[in-house]
């Protein structure tokens, strides 16, 4: 038996993007929904500063997922959202970054719609754009790159096309942004090199992008794996590949004469 709200209607689920980490980057609409939510189900990468915006009277439930550590299975999360929508008018599913950029928002929306629940998507700033920006790496620049590809380094076994076509990406995009790719670089980089990218191709890893603890590791295809080991550089991190990675260093070099050699 399905229990409905007192007016006989189901509540509404809002898939809200929390942004990449800096609480100032959540949208006005997203913040307003958090302040008025009756229930919030949030992911692991949502910061405590964002969670502090939630209505103190709301149910607050952790559904976070990390590599190797799943608080709830995906099916359990969507079932939970459906149950919450039966008793609350405003339910927020709070996801890091943007719900529809490697955030499983599409899968959750599909399940909720099938259950007869109204869903609204509130986009967020994705880490693949924000982290490079905070690291002063422009993904496109007239002198460096006129194309960018966003790709996951962590494939789903059930996808209709089982493997990323790294050769096509290497040949078709001047900037490559990889989500969840730190632990897969040892297999990804050889495929990109087979497609024509050289060992001197610039690569940057940005950890905890937009947060105070943000870290950046810059190298080349030839050096980056050893650098990761030496620095013990851990996920989560965004990987940026292409000439744009060299932009900050080149800019400092150009400005040195103006600034008297000050970096």
UniProtKB/Swiss-Prot annotation:
SUPFAM superfamilies: Tetrapyrrole methylase
Annotated coiled-coil segments of the chain: none
Record-level Gene Ontology MF annotations: uroporphyrin-III C-methyltransferase activity
Known EC number: 2.1.1.107
Gene3D superfamilies the record matches: Cobalt-precorrin-4 Transmethylase, Domain 1, Methyltransferase, Cobalt-precorrin-4 Transmethylase, Domain 2
Record pathway: Cofactor biosynthesis; adenosylcobalamin biosynthesis; precorrin-2 from uroporphyrinogen III: step 1/1; Porphyrin-containing compound metabolism; siroheme biosynthesis; precorrin-2 from uroporphyrinogen III: step 1/1
Enzyme class: transferase
Keyword S-adenosyl-L-methionine attributed: yes
Matching Pfam families: TP_methylase (PF00590)
GO BP terms: cobalamin biosynthetic process; methylation; siroheme biosynthetic process
Keyword Phosphoprotein among UniProt keywords: no
Binding positions for S-adenosyl-L-homocysteine per the UniProt entry: 20, 96-98, 126-127, 180, 237
Entries under PROSITE patterns matching the protein: SUMT_1, SUMT_2
UniProt keyword terms in alphabetical order: Cobalamin biosynthesis, Methyltransferase, Porphyrin biosynthesis, S-adenosyl-L-methionine, Transferase
Substrates-to-products reaction catalysed: uroporphyrinogen III + 2 S-adenosyl-L-methionine = precorrin-2 + 2 S-adenosyl-L-homocysteine + H(+)
Protein family membership: Belongs to the precorrin methyltransferase family.
NCBIfam families: cobA_cysG_Cterm, PRK06136.1
PANTHER family membership: S-ADENOSYL-L-METHIONINE-DEPENDENT UROPORPHYRINOGEN III METHYLTRANSFERASE, CHLOROPLASTIC, SIROHEME SYNTHASE-RELATED
Reported function: It is a step in the biosynthesis of both cobalamin (vitamin B12) and siroheme.
Protein known as: Uroporphyrinogen-III C-methyltransferase
Source organism: Synechocystis sp. (strain ATCC 27184 / PCC 6803 / Kazusa)
Gene responsible for this protein: cobA
């Amino acid at each position: 038996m399905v229990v409905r709200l007192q007016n006989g209607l189901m509540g509404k689920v809002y898939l809200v993007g929390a942004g990449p980490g800096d609480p100032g980057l959540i949208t006005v609409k997203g913040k307003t929904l958090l302040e008025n939510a009756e229930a919030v189900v949030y992911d692991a990468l949502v910061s405590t500063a964002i969670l502090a915006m939630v209505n103190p009277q709301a149910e607050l439930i952790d559904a976070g997922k990390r590599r190797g550590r799943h608080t709830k299975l995906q099916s359990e999360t969507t079932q939970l959202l459906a149950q919450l929508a039966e008793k609350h008018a405003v339910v927020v599913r709070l996801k890091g970054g943007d719900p529809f950029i490697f955030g499983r928002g599409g899968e959750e929306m599909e399940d909720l719609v099938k259950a007869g629940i109204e869903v609204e998507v509130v986009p967020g700033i994705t880490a693949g754009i924000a982290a490079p920006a905070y690291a002063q790496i422009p993904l496109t620049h007239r002198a460096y790159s006129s194309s960018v590809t966003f790709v996951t380094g962590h494939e789903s076994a059930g996808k209709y096309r089982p493997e990323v076509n790294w050769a096509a990406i290497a040949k078709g995009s001047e900037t490559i942004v990889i989500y969840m790719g730190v632990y897969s670089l040892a297999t990804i980089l050889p495929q990109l090199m087979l497609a024509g990218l050289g060992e001197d191709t610039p690569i940057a890893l940005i950890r905890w992008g937009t947060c105070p603890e943000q870290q950046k590791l810059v190298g080349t295809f030839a050096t980056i794996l050893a650098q990761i080991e030496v620095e013990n550089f851990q996920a989560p991190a965004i990987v940026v590949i292409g000439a744009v990675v060299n932009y900050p260093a080149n800019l400092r070099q150009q400005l040195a004469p103006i600034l008297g050699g000050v970096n």
